[in-house]
């Protein structure tokens, strides 16, 4: 089986569907991974790291692959050959046109954002992990924007009261 990892095209998207570590694990299972050149740049993974993990890099991750894994659905569904599978956050309940075009192109799609948030599916639950990271980042951004110390600080020279916030 060949898995393709495309470069994300959505504006501001910095995530990548597979890390070099996950790529290495797939390779040990006999799965060949093709990573589009620059796909990991936004997440600070170089092409060399993917190659060291056993992946090959190419100008496109859509050519001659059985499965495409992406964070979001590719903009150009026509890049996917009939019989290819796509695993991404497709938002099928919102983007009916995308679902229709995937079906018309003969692409089997797995919408990762519709996997139930239950214990049995926890290892595939992308929404909980992304929400957790987004919440953490929001607190960091808020702390930076506040311009005052978050924790209470006690020193010989005095005490700085903790910041108060609402999440």
Regions found by a protein language model. Name each.
Residues 2, 76-164:
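Glycine/serine-rich phosphate-binding loop and adjoining beta1-alpha1 elements at the start
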């Amino acid at each position: 089986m060949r898995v393709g990892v495309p470069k994300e095209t959505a504006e501001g998207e910095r995530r990548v569907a597979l890390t070099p570590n996950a790529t290495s694990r797939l390779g040990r299972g006999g799965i060949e991974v093709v990573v589009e050149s620059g796909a990991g740049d936004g997440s600070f993974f170089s092409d060399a790291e993917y190659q060291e993990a056993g992946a090959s890099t190419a100008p496109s991750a859509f050519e001659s692959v059985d499965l495409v894994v992406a964070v979001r659905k590719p903009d150009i569904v026509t890049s996917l050959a009939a019989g290819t599978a796509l695993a991404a956050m497709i938002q099928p309940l919102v983007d009916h046109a995308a679902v229709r075009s995937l079906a018309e192109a003969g692409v089997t799609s797995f919408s990762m954002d519709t996997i139930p948030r239950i214990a049995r599916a926890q290892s595939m639950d992308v929404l909980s992990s992304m929400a957790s990271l987004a919440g953490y980042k929001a607190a960091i951004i808020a702390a930076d924007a506040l311009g005052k110390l978050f924790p209470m600080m006690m020193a010989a020279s005095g005490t700085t009261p903790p910041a108060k916030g609402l999440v």
